[in-house]
Design a protein with these regions (language model features):
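Cleavable N-terminal export/targeting peptides
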Residues: 1-33
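Active-site cleft segment of glycoside hydrolase catalytic domains centered on the general acid/base Glu
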Residues: 188
Length: 269
């Protein structure tokens, strides 16, 4: 549910240091920039908890599964689907897979498959040996989840993002700018949501660490904007297997108070 925006920085850094290149959503942290693998399969576990402006807490468990295919040197295609369990009073998930406010109900538990997400990422040529890395990503989220269970708004959402990083020695600062275009579900007043993230990635021992500050405008005027800090560590644990651990802390009522998870990625050349 977090931070595909930071993957491009980690990718550029790893490529510059070791000739090995490694994104919401979080599974793409390992996948996005891997230039040595043609197909990447990922799965893991994510837990988040927060009040989202409501008196009662909402807990969300996500078990994601994703595939990413490097079609050419400059084009990557991806798809992801997740099993979701949500417990709390705000039981309608918005375009960012977080509860929408304004739905006061008794505390409920709902679960099932979420929306199907598909993406395409274009790596902009910056010249051989250039320290710059620029990725442009478009994503569509299709309403395949159960609307009656509150796991989707029932409408198609779109997003675009630009990720820019610059390699300096063993680290790479990065910035990401994005925009999510929400569908228009009946009875729910949603608005489009810009986002921004700034941070850095660095080689640490046999792995890589990334930290960032993330902001996203709330999809609803009833909610606060999301402000959070994020950190992740990723390393190779076998020839074709990477392990990533991550966590974030919310700085506003519009973000989860805490979020954390792990991700395993298998790579095929």
């Amino acid at each position: 549910m977090h931070c595909s925006r930071v993957a491009v920085a980690l990718a550029a850094l790893a490529a510059g240091v070791s000739a090995y290149a490694q994104d919401r959503d979080i599974e793409e942290i390992v996948n996005a920039g891997d230039t040595g693998s043609k197909i990447l399969l990922s799965s893991g576990f994510d837990f988040s908890s927060g009040h989202y402006g409501e008196p009662d807490r909402t807990d969300i468990v996500v078990v994601p599964a994703s595939v990413r295919v490097r079609a050419t040197d400059w084009l990557s295609l991806g798809a992801s689907l997740a099993w979701i369990r949500i417990e709390g009073p705000g039981v309608v998930l918005g375009p960012d897979n977080e509860p929408l406010p304004g739905f006061p109900t008794t505390r409920q538990v709902r679960s099932g498959l979420g929306d199907l997400s598909a993406s395409a990422t274009v790596s902009v040529p910056t010249g051989n040996g250039s320290p710059w890395s620029i990725d442009l990503t478009g994503r569509v989220k299709l309403p395949t989840a159960s609307e009656s269970r509150g796991l989707t708004t029932g409408k198609t959402d779109f997003s675009i993002a630009a990720d820019v990083s610059y390699v300096v020695g063993n680290w790479a600062p990065f910035i990401d700018l994005g925009m999510r275009f929400a569908g228009d579900p009946e009875g729910i007043d949603l608005r489009n949501s810009p986002s921004a993230s700034v941070g850095a990635a660095a080689i640490l021992g046999k792995g890589a660490v990334i930290v960032s500050y993330d902001w996203q405008r709330a999809f609803s005027s009833l909610a606060e904007d999301s402000h959070s800090v994020f950190a992740a560590y990723s390393r190779k644990v076998a020839k074709r297997l990477d392990l990533t651990g991550y966590g974030s802390i919310g700085l506003s009522a519009g973000a989860p108070a805490v979020e954390g998870g792990v991700l395993l990625t298998v790579k095929f050349e």
